[in-house]
Amino acid sequence: MKFTKIFTGLLLAMMLFVTPAQAQRSQSADDPSGFVVLGEFIPDIIQEIRYYTTYNFVGEKIDGYEMPCALMTIEAAEALKKVSDDVMKMGYRLKIFDAYRPQMGVDHFMRWAANVNDTRMKKYFYPKIAKDRIIPEGYVAVKSGHSRGSTVDLTLFDMKTGKDVDMGGTFDYFGEKSHPDYKKITKTQYKNRMILRNVMIKHGFKPLAEEWWHFTLKDEPYPDTYFTFPVKLLQK
């Protein structure tokens, strides 16, 4: 009887102590019910959804981007709202380039990368990278963390100047210059990168070593699900 009571107590304690990783959920890849529209959830953000336009490394509107809006999981959006509140106090707003990316968009990237003759945007986004090296060097891949819904590409917008903060490099540039710790930039540019990086880390996001603009919620709710629904306003 004593052993039974001890075992029951341990079991109850284990049930009560659930880590974020243990709280991960499974969901159908075509089900957007765990997502929100960032512009509605965080009204202060600015959205410049590059893959809805032709100004991106592919040079054409990307499959799956039906509207120029950003979507994220509820958990990631809640964390990003805290980031937004913090940077607003510093005189900045968040500018979003991309968030949730449907798998069909990733597939579009792969088709483009396989066509080595299409280099129309090379001088803007990958001037120092041969087109046939884009896949081997990992600039695009068959799966993207963006498709799990808790990754965001963003920068800071200075409310005083009315311009993007100078990060010493541009969004989606393929090369060492995009690494957060790249040394051949000014102290001010590096400081700006660190302002963004530190506030994102503070609120539960982890950075990427190759891209200063890229962050993923550390305790993302769907770490194994690559969603397929298109980017558009969600039905309420």
Write out the residue ranges for each language-model feature.
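Extracytoplasmic cell-surface/polysaccharide-interacting catalytic and binding patches
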Residues: 22-99, 106-107, 111-210, 220-236
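Bacterial N-terminal signal peptides
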Residues: 8-18
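Positively charged n-region of N-terminal signal peptides that target proteins for export
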Residues: 1-6
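Conserved metal-phosphate-binding beta-hairpin within the catalytic cores
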Residues: 215
